[in-house]
Amino acid sequence: MTVSRDHSDSDEWSRWLLNLRHGGDPTFDRAIRPELEAYADRVLDGAELKTDMTLADIGTGEGLVAFRAIDRVGPSLHVVLTDISATMLRHAEGLASERGVRQQCTFVECAADELTGIPDTSVDVVTTRAVLAYVANKAVALSEFYRILKPGGRISLAEPIMQDDAFAACALKRMVDERGTQSAGDPFLPLLHRWKAAQFPDTPEKIAASPIANFSERTLFESVRVSGFRQIHLELHIDLRPSTIPSWSIFLETSPHPWAPPLSTIMADLFSPEERQTFETTMRPLVESGQALTTGRTAYLNAVKPVT
């Protein structure tokens, strides 16, 4: 899921994938694996892979999609794994060796919008899982996908839709601004806004400038259409579920995406000691009760490059 050169520190991706996604807790990492594998499997369902094909897994991260593709198709599948993070590519290459599939894999360090080293019309399928969301110029990335695909080739994408999270941060900001000094009667509300605003844009201007928030499933569909793809099918999945985070300590150390600091950093940098106590007194019982809910929004899209 690591892709764009918009942020100067490419290793932010490895820090998130190998640590912040699961709060540095190996048990929690294992607990969320089935959910991650379900995302990958749905991408592969849309990929329609067959024997003797070449798959380009863009922003491969740990190689989850790539390795599950090999498990499905077998030894005739060749996979090109790309990532902007050299750390993640090394990690994925090590996993490929452990799984005995290194000979089926080619590793390419590049961004999703600059697929250097992959020739024109050289792959049958392009997959992404949480990749385009982080690319500033999604049209350029899609044109690269189109370039490397053979005529009749497919894209199968799974992208998080985080625009509603940004809209919620904007709503919190408006509430705090409208209440002004009256917010003193509700000391938690400004802290809630501060937390969310550190992880998602909280003004229309910030949303417009943010790759993760300035697009929706509809604009994603239209971008794919304008890029020349046809037979486009998109499904938006919105799921309200109980939070899987099992403890306050893990809650503090996780973050929702690679560009978001964990709550522990936000509280240390932006809250006073008194505010940290107020926030924990309010939030910790909810987290530890197991009653907290989370909403996930994912767009699954597949499309075909025309033969002519």
Q: Where are the language model's segments positioned?
A:
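C-terminal helical/coil "lid" or tail adjacent to the Rossmann-like core of SAM-dependent
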Residues: 2-31, 231-289
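Conserved alpha-helix/loop element of class I SAM-dependent methyltransferases that forms part
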Residues: 34-53, 68
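Class I SAM-dependent methyltransferase SAM/SAH-binding core
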Residues: 54-58, 62-115
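A short acidic, Gly/Pro-enriched loop at the edge of an enzyme's catalytic core
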Residues: 113-125
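A short SAM/SAH-binding and catalytic strip from SAM-dependent methyltransferases
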Residues: 124-139, 161
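A short glycine-rich, Lys/Arg-flanked "PGG" loop and its adjoining helix->strand segment in the class I
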Residues: 139-154
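Conserved class I S-adenosyl-L-methionine
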Residues: 156-195
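Short alpha-helix
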Residues: 212-227
